[in-house]
Amino acid sequence: MRQTARTAAKLAAVAFMGAGAMASFSMSAHAQKTTEQGIQEYRDMLADGNPAELVELRGEDIWQKPQGPKNASLEQCDLGAGPGKLEGAVATMPRFFSDAGKVMDVETRLVHCMVTLQGRDVAEITKKPYSSAGEKPTELESLVAYVYAQSRGATIKVPQGHPEEKASRARGEKIFFYRAGPYDFSCASCHATDDQRIRLQGLPNLTKPEPAQAAFAAWPAYRVSQGAVRSMQWRMYDCFRQQRFPELKYGSQASIDLITFLGVKAEGGTMQATSLKR
């Protein structure tokens, strides 16, 4: 009888501890969900007056303005849908361009057009691609905001028909999981697990379709905390910075490959850029 009583007491204690753990987990999950909902409500309130719209208008002016030694505009720039056709184009990038002989993302393609159509110098164009706090948006930030806005609502479909496109995606996947730096981090350290966050910022699991769609569709974005439009190239650059990796060069092959990998993961999503971020 005593043995039976002791066994029953132990089982009751285990059950109580299990119930407590489940309750704690449930409360934690509820708190996280509530936090996410609060953040989303905040974004929704701000989205009605997204300052990125002003940057988009500036980008439209730059797109139409004749510049460079050739005194030409960018209106014949081909982003994959044909010269000058912008609607839905960025939802299918990065992609292979036969005239350049390589895979390009939106930003490297814009630089290519500025060089080939306008006769401008690539080093001059890319020497300062990102604005600093309190500065006006750069030419590239403005152009990016404008061209992305023309694909808002388009379905993401990053092509994989060309061997170079497949190779770019494969390299991007390797980079995503590659661990290095003083913290032995990879992109996957933050973005390959569910329900992770840093401070109030949720970290999407980019190996899953829905989170990948939401993330890819939202960039470029107006970053409220910085008062600036930040592009997808900047997003890759800043992730490398946070991992304490060597500085990611603007328009580098590694950056394009990572964006290709994420774009393929995001297939079927709906473009929302230029969106609003914290």
Predicted regions, residues:
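Hydrophobic, well-structured mid-protein blocks that either form specific transmembrane helices
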Residues: L143-V147, P159-Q160
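Short, charged low-complexity linear segments at domain edges
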Residues: D44-E60, A154-E173
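Electron-transfer interface patches adjacent to heme c in soluble/periplasmic c-type cytochromes
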Residues: A31-L54, Q64-S142, R152-G153, Y178-R278
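Bacterial N-terminal signal peptides that target proteins for export
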Residues: R2-A15
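A residue-level detector for conformationally permissive "hinge/kink" positions
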Residues: K10-A12, H30, P51, E164
